[in-house]
Amino acid sequence: MSQAFPAPAKLNLFLHVVGRRDDGYHLLQSVFRLIDRADTVHLELRDDGRIVREGALPGVSEDQDLTVRAARLLQPYARPGAGVGIRLDKRLPMGGGLGGGSSDAATVLLALNRLWEVDLPRQRLQALALRLGADVPVFVFGQTAFAEGVGELLQPIGAPVAWYVVLTPPVHVPTAAIFAAPELTRNTPALKIAPFSAGMGHNDLEPVVVGRYPEVGRHLQWLGQFGEARMTGSGACVFASFATEDAARSVLQALPDTMQGFVARGLDKHPLYDFVPE
């Protein structure tokens, strides 16, 4: 029987590029906040040792699919014959900066860690997650996090109760191209971790994306009438924070017909946080 598990989106409340390693990876500082908008990952255990993707994502082969790769990565730690069928219900846009693919992969790791009775501790599961991509460990970490390094050095950080209006411009932003852009500044001074405030920092990738994708700038400008609007990740999604659900929903109701978006609540912990032994 299939079981359903949420894969929540993330927002980068700020994202600073503070340097670049010799291997080309960028050194970052960011605060990651999970929100209650989510994909759903359906898992059905098998005893034939096979990992089967049910339904294809457009343009994503099975070998590239992060959910399949996550299951394959954990499988050697499981009992012989452990397998799984994987099906995704996508609500999060691809190429939107909400971490949907990374979150889907993390949910597979978190859920199968329990369902396959692997019971790896969180730090070991995060190390596996990093092999799938720089954004995957934060979803396994499962809390609002101050991130450094390439995004894998994580510390828990308190964040206020917040509701977010998230707008989804109709463009797909390729992350690698934005990080490779010659106009990207890579020398933002590093911050010391401190009590987080909503106006802290900025997103170094935002000017690059706005310069290449004017639709993102148009959405930022509209949302900026109501609060401090920012881009998450490498875009294209943009967001603003509000103290109450009513305030956020009143902004969403004013959204022009030419734009799309949603309201989401900030989460303090991942819904599957307790699936991992400490």
Swiss-Prot record:
Keyword Amino-acid biosynthesis: no
Full protein name: 4-diphosphocytidyl-2-C-methyl-D-erythritol kinase
Gene3D superfamilies assigned to the protein according to its UniProt record, in alphabetical order: 3.30.230.10, GHMP kinase, C-terminal domain (3.30.70.890)
Organism: Thiobacillus denitrificans (strain ATCC 25259 / T1)
E.C. code: 2.7.1.148
Record keywords: ATP-binding, Isoprene biosynthesis, Kinase, Nucleotide-binding, Transferase
Top-rank EC class of the record's enzyme: transferase
An individual GO BP term: terpenoid biosynthetic process
Role: Catalyzes the phosphorylation of the position 2 hydroxy group of 4-diphosphocytidyl-2C-methyl-D-erythritol.
Keyword hit for Cytoplasm: no
InterPro entries recorded: GHMP_kinase_C_dom, GHMP_kinase_C_sf, GHMP_kinase_N_dom, IspE, Ribosomal_Su5_D2-typ_SF, Ribsml_uS5_D2-typ_fold_subgr
Superkingdom of the source species: Bacteria
Lineage of source species: Bacteria, Pseudomonadati, Pseudomonadota, Betaproteobacteria, Nitrosomonadales
Binding site for ATP: 93-103
Active-site residues annotated for this sequence: 10, 135
GO molecular function: 4-(cytidine 5'-diphospho)-2-C-methyl-D-erythritol kinase activity; ATP binding
Coiled coil (residue ranges): none
Record-stated family: Belongs to the GHMP kinase family. IspE subfamily.
Catalytic reactions of this protein: 4-CDP-2-C-methyl-D-erythritol + ATP = 4-CDP-2-C-methyl-D-erythritol 2-phosphate + ADP + H(+)
Pathway where this protein functions: Isoprenoid biosynthesis; isopentenyl diphosphate biosynthesis via DXP pathway; isopentenyl diphosphate from 1-deoxy-D-xylulose 5-phosphate: step 3/6
